[in-house]
Every structure is written in C-alpha cells, then in structure tokens.
From Swiss-Prot:
It comes from the Bacteria. HAMAP family: NDH1_NuoN_1 (MF_00445). This is NADH-quinone oxidoreductase subunit N. It is found in: Cell inner membrane. Keywords: Cell inner membrane, Cell membrane, Membrane, NAD, Quinone, Translocase, Transmembrane, Transmembrane helix, Transport, Ubiquinone. NDH-1 shuttles electrons from NADH, via FMN and iron-sulfur (Fe-S) centers, to quinones in the respiratory chain. The immediate electron acceptor for the enzyme in this species is believed to be ubiquinone. Couples the redox reaction to proton translocation (for every two electrons transferred, four hydrogen ions are translocated across the cytoplasmic membrane), and thus conserves the redox energy in a proton gradient. It is a multi-pass membrane protein. NCBIfam families: NDH_I_N (TIGR01770), PRK05777.1-3 (NF004440). NDH-1 is composed of 14 different subunits. Subunits NuoA, H, J, K, L, M, N constitute the membrane sector of the complex. Its EC number is 7.1.1.-.
C-alpha cells in the first residue's frame, strides 16, 4: 500500500517538508533573518531523524516495488550521513557569519543534498539511484559556488558541475546498458541476469561504466581530478561537507550496486575495485607531500582514504563491507575534528589555509595543538588511535579474501602518507614562530567539536569503549547487504 511505502520514507519526507517550509519562511521575512536559526534547526532535525532511524528501524523492508530498500545497511549509512551533516552545520556557523555567507539557502541546499544521499543509499533500482545522485549533486554544485564574489569559488563550482555532469553521463550510459541487457532496472533483476558464467558482454560494459561513474563520486583515482581544485576553491564549510557526508553516501551506494546488482559476478568487478583502491592510496599519499595549502592536502588525503575504504569493498565479503563501514565512520569523525580547526585558522582576522601558518602553534595553544596532533596521528593510522583500527580492519579483510598484494600495497601507502601528517605536527611543535603564525582564536562550537572528536578518536580503543559500539551495527549492516 502507498501509505506503507511512504512510512518507509518518513525521514526523507520530513526533511523535504522542512526545506520547503524554510524557503517559504525566507520569502515572508527579511532577507537571511532566519539563516542562523535555520542552520541550528536543520542540525537539530538531522540529529532527531538519525535517532528516529536508529530506534524505529527493524529488519528489511521495500517500498515502491523494490525501488527503495530500508535495511540495516541503509540505516547505518543514513545515520552516519545525518550526524556528519549536523556536525558540519554546527561548526560552520562562526565562519559563515564572518565571511558573510550565512544565507538561508545554505541549510536548505544541505537538506536537499542529504535527502538525495539518503535516497542513494536506499536505492534498489537504477532509476532511484540516479534520482538520489542527481538531487545530491545539483544541490552541491550550487553550494560549491556560494561565494559569488570569489573567482576561485565560482571556478570550483563550474569544475564540479562539468566533471560531475560527465560522471553522471557515464553512470547513465552504464545504467542504460544494464537495463538493455538485463531487461530491468531493479538490482534484484540485474543480479539474476548476471548470474553464472554467461553474463552478457553488454552487461559487463554497463558494470564498467557504472563503476567509473561511482568512482568519480568517491574521488577515487584516476577519477579524482576535480577534488583538489573544488576542495581548495569552495568555502571551507562546503569543503568540510564534501569530505564527509557525500563520501559516505557514495561509498555505500558503491557497495550496494556491486553486491545487490552484481553480487553474482564478484570476480568481474573485484579486480577493478582493487585497482581503483591501490591507485587511489598511492596517488593520494604521494601527491599530498608537496602541498602547501591544507585544504588541498585534505583533498589528496581523502583520495588516499577512499582507496583504503575501497580495499575493504574489493574483498567482496561481508567482512570487507563491515570493515568499509567502520572505516567510513571513523574517517568522518577524523575529518569533522580536523575541519573544526581549519575553519578557525585566522591571521590578523583573515581566514588562511597555508600549512606554514601552523608554525609554533603549540606554544600559543597547547590544548588545541594536542587535539590536532591526535587527528593527524589518527589520519596517519598510528596506534592506538581509531584511525589505526579502521586501517587494520580493511587490511585484515583484504588478506582474508586472498588479496595479500593489496594489503601490502596499503601498508606501503600508509607509511608514505604518514609523512605529510607528521609534517604538520612537526610545524606546530618545532616550527619557528613568525609574523605569519595563526592568531589562535577559536569559537566555542568549533572548539568543542575539535576537542570532542579528539576525545572520540583518542579514547575509542579503551577497553569497555570498543570503538563506541559501531562494530555490531556495521556487522549487522554488512550481513544484511550480503545475504
């Protein structure tokens, strides 16, 4: 019944109605008067919806004849997306106000992007997949170019739009091939057509094009070319958003497509995903070494981290998917904490992103410097921080799946990547103070966000805490996807 179908989409419907109410409210009030309240209200609603999904979710359900799937896997991804988007909205308030970017459109566009992400991770059909992906993408194209008086921001939005349209074209072409040779757009029908050793060649080409389109969305090399420029040119809160929620959505969608639609031909996509993983890990690790802008560094860092997440996915097992989900949850926490600090990097009242400005920061702000040290070491995978356990999980999954060569490559890439994280720590503690150093000022909410994430990352390994209990939900989610 239609009412049962709509009940499954309750969070998406509530968020969409809230976005429309926000638009109407802005029309009938003075310009941007509701912007700050709208941001806080949106963050609160995201948290409420995450709690609602966690409490009410049970088993697996389908809506609209299998186009939408509500299961443990989609719920895990949705909760991660909602909480990360809420955190980004909260830590961005000070920056957006100072930069005169606090417009009512900002939270509205974030809501629409999040709704698109939630549809993506619940997609059980190529049409639902494409609808969710385009809703997310169209909203993010706009927010990337929000700073209309900045050439770099406009350039970032244009590059993201052009290359995003190319990736959408690849995805759509692959979907059309899959539909043509499988005779259906539903994942359940495609996996039946792909079973056995006689998969149509056209369906294999469809898989390749779909994989290429999804690789663009997760910033996997060699489809990463948009990431550094868009990260650098976009307003920093938007960069923080790009580095968190959309990555979770795209990676979850990637997992759902390869397992739900092409789970019967793991051998055909496993090597492709493994190739994407190893190229991403090494390109991100090596290219980040020479960066002088911390936002570009975080862009290459995200490329490398997506390679590690793809390593878990390439295992083709429930253990691999579980490791990928754990890795993405930890990755989001690390990036929220890091960007909470980047958002407040100021010199003489002006926002800066030069890595050199961190020189001797520890002598001014020892507490903040210690929190950043925790973030950097965790991103590098130094034990016993959470980042180490995330990498350990995907490495073990790869080894257990027989991909020993990929695990060895991951260890080497991790060692290379540790250099640029340690360089930041070295600058903070052993660099020479000069006139280009940071002011050290930080708003209350970003400061709380930084310290909270540092505590999460630093204490997650403690016995009794056990990664804050994300292992059991991740295991359930993986088992639900690979059934």
């Amino acid at each position: 019944m239609i009412s049962a179908d709509l009940a499954i989409l309750t969070p998406e419907i509530v968020l969409s109605l809230f976005a429309m109410a926000g638009l109407l409210g802005a029309v009938y009030t003075s310009k941007d008067a509701l912007a700050s309240a709208m941001c806080w209200g949106t963050a609160a609603l995201f948290i409420i919806m995450a709690f609602y999904i966690g409490v009410t979710g049970n088993g697996a359900r389908e809506a609209f004849d299998g186009m939408i799937i509500d299961d443990a896997f989609s719920r895990f991804a949705k909760i991660t997306i909602l909480l990360s988007a809420a955190a980004i909205l909260m830590i961005s308030q000070d920056y957006m106000a100072k930069a005169d970017l606090l417009r009512f459109e900002f939270p509205v566009l974030i809501i629409l992007a999040v709704v698109g992400m939630m549809i993506m991770v619940s997609a059980g059909d190529l049409i639902a997949l494409y609808m969710g992906l385009e809703l997310q993408s169209l909203a993010l194209y706009v927010v990337a170019a929000m700073r209309r008086d900045s050439v770099r921001s406009t350039e970032a939005g244009l590059k993201y739009f052009v290359l995003g349209a190319l990736s959408s074209g690849l995805l759509l072409y692959g979907s059309s091939l899959a539909y043509g040779f499988a005779g259906t757009t539903q994942f359940a029908g495609i996996i039946e057509a792909a079973q056995g050793g006689d998969m149509p060649l056209g369906l294999l080409f469809g898989l390749v094009f779909i994989t290429a389109g999804l690789a663009f969305k997760v910033s996997a090399a060699p489809f990463h070319m948009w990431t550094p420029d868009v990260y650098e040119g976009s307003p920093t809160p938007i960069t923080a958003l790009f580095a968190t929620a959309p990555k979770v959505a795209a990676m979850a969608l990637f997992a759902r497509v390869v397992h739900d639609a092409f789970g019967g031909v793991i051998g055909d996509w496993q090597q492709i995903v493994a190739f994407l993983a190893v190229v991403s890990m090494f390109l991100g690790a090596i290219a980040a070494i020479g960066q002088t802008d911390i936002k570009r560094l975080m862009a290459y860092s995200s490329i490398s981290h997506m390679g590690f997440a793809l390593m878990g996915l390439s295992a083709g097992t429930a253990q691999g998917v579980e490791a990928m989900l754990i890795y993405m949850a930890i990755y989001v926490a690390m990036n929220i904490g890091t960007f909470a600090f980047i958002l407040t990097m100021e010199r003489n009242g002006r926002h800066v992103t030069e890595i050199s400005s961190l020189s001797a920061f520890a002598s001014k702000e020892p507490t903040k410097a210690l929190a950043i040290l925790v973030m950097m070491f965790s991103l590098a995978g130094v034990p016993p921080l959470l980042g180490f356990f995330g990498k350990y999980a995907v490495l073990v999954a790869a080894v257990d799946a027989g991909l020993v060569w990929l695990a060895i490559a991951g260890v080497i890439a991790s060692v290379i990547g540790a250099f640029y994280y340690i360089r930041i720590v070295y600058l903070m503690y052993f660099g020479e103070a000069d006139e280009g150093a940071l002011d050290g000022k930080m708003g209350l909410v970003p400061y709380v966000g930084l310290i909270a994430m540092a505590l999460v990352i630093g204490l997650g390994w403690v016995p009794g805490v056990n990664l804050f209990g994300i292992e059991a939900p991740a295991e359930t989610a993986a088992a639900m996807l690979i059934r």
